Regions:
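Transition segment at domain starts
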Residues: 141-173
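Sec/Tat signal peptide C-region and signal peptidase I cleavage site
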Residues: 19-23
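Terminal connector regions
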Residues: 56-68, 112-154, 233-263
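Surface-exposed binding patches on compact interaction domains or structured appendages
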Residues: 25-30, 54-108, 195-198, 202-207
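Short proline/glycine- and polar residue-rich coil/turn motifs
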Residues: 97-105, 214-223, 254
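Beta-sheet-dominated interaction scaffolds and their linkers
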Residues: 24-58, 94-96, 162-181, 214
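Ligand-binding face of N-terminal immunoglobulin V-set domains in extracellular IgSF glycoproteins
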Residues: 47-49, 93-128
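Short strand-edge motifs at loop-to-beta-strand transitions and within beta-strands
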Residues: 34, 46, 105-109, 223-227
Length: 263
């Protein structure tokens, strides 16, 4: 029987502690996120695969949480029910599971969309937490370490979709490298995620390919998206400016031509 729970958010491994924490939480989860669609009054049932890669039986605690996607692309989980959260729509199979060593178990997540739900995006994540372990650090001190994996769910209700406005936003230094940047505003009702076929020749004559970061742009947000540059051999490149970037940017079933100079 599914237990009515509260849910929302991302697919990242958060290791809290030091040392061999990964060995203490040897779980592999697939898929890392779900991007789904539903009608008002509809029901979705999905299965998350959890594989215990350790040599002993593992216990995982299952729960849900709301999340905040920070300006620095960090994710913060919270148990507090967020305004307009869709977590009351969600049920999960159990609060705890036991996974045999080397085995994959399936875990069901169910979303029941209310009949009167407006076009919107329901976002949530299943949190999978391992037992706390005492791990010795380099100084020989025992440190409590726990592992957590969050699996993102996006459910577009009644045709909810992103509406992106994309413009060139100059050049910014990212991790010591100057990269072209796009300004992306989402005035739609669902998240957007960019993909692109972009290329250009820089001031040194390098033939380069440009790829946007694939972080989500949530409804109502404006984010700056870097374009990483590689040579035709796939090697990371340092761009000599000015450079004109041309090609096509896509998100969902939408696409737009792009032709902009960066200096």
């Amino acid at each position: 029987m599914l237990i009515n729970k509260k849910i929302w958010v991302t697919a990242s491994l958060c290791l809290l502690g030091v040392g061999n924490a990964l060995a203490q939480f040897a779980a592999v989860v697939s898929p890392p996120r779900f991007e789904l669609s539903a009608k008002p009054g509809g029901r979705l049932t999905e299965v998350v695969g959890i594989t215990n890669n350790s040599a002993v039986q593992a216990r995982y605690r299952m729960k849900t949480a709301d999340w905040i996607f920070g300006a620095d692309t960090s994710v913060t989980f919270t148990d507090t029910l967020a305004p307009e959260s869709c977590r009351p729509w969600v049920s999960i199979e159990s609060r705890e599971i036991m996974a045999p060593p080397g085995r994959r178990v399936g875990f069901r997540v169910q979303v029941d969309v209310p009949p009167d739900a407006p076009p919107r995006e329901c976002r949530f994540a299943l949190l999978i937490e391992g037992d706390e372990q005492q791990v010795k650090n380099e100084s020989g001190l025992s440190v409590p370490v726990a592992g957590r994996i969050g699996v993102i769910f996006y459910v577009a209700v009644d045709g909810a979709a992103p509406l992106l406005d994309i413009t060139a936003a100059g050049v910014r230094e990212v991790n010591g490298v100057r990269l072209p940047v796009l300004k992306v505003k989402n005035s739609g009702t669902a998240h957007g995620r960019l993909s692109a076929f972009l290329s250009g020749v820089d001031a040194k004559g390098q033939n380069l390919d440009f790829t946007p970061s694939t972080f989500p742009i949530l409804p109502g947000e404006t984010r700056f998206v870097e374009l990483s540059a590689t040579t035709r051999r796939g090697e990371v490149a340092r761009v000599a400016y000015p450079v004109t970037v041309r090609g096509q940017i896509e998100w969902g079933d939408q696409r737009m031509p792009f032709d902009q100079s960066f200096e």
